[in-house]
């Protein structure tokens, strides 16, 4: 999925929009930020504010903003667009929300309730944070070996370690807890300091100002990894 996201972020241009200009489009993002985000770094690319402004300008030039309440009628209209954002990251409130208000645009935000108010960290974000800390050690061989032992996998080199680690399934939560302990990272304190996700108050403020929120599953765990009962 990360590869698909990276491709989508790279190909935004008037040339590509020309190919789909006679239909509604729903560009989607996760985050807009100008600095490095450890919880995102190893997952996918993301755009800065300047590029996001350019995207809005490009879309507004070729399309008409689609009000959310008119989305059911969208199939009958041409050249409309509606922005969507996944995962409920904090930058939705601190960066994206002000820009959309400035431009007079609406949007839909799909969130995972388990992470609202920074109660805990999303599994894939935990993996990226851990890799970022391991990177600080210049991928020390001793640390890599300990992590591989805890998570029960073997690797050839630094590259294969990263690939395997990022593909660990969410059932490995307990092992990932141990890696946090190994690296001496207090996850609760990290969340309190970084505040990776939206709060209920921020969501309410945005809703009061005409923005829409939808569900993106409770915890974003891959459904194919869950039993029918867990789903």
Model-derived segments and spans:
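Catalytic alpha-helical scaffold of carbohydrate-active enzymes acting on polysaccharides/glycoconjugates
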Residues: 1-231
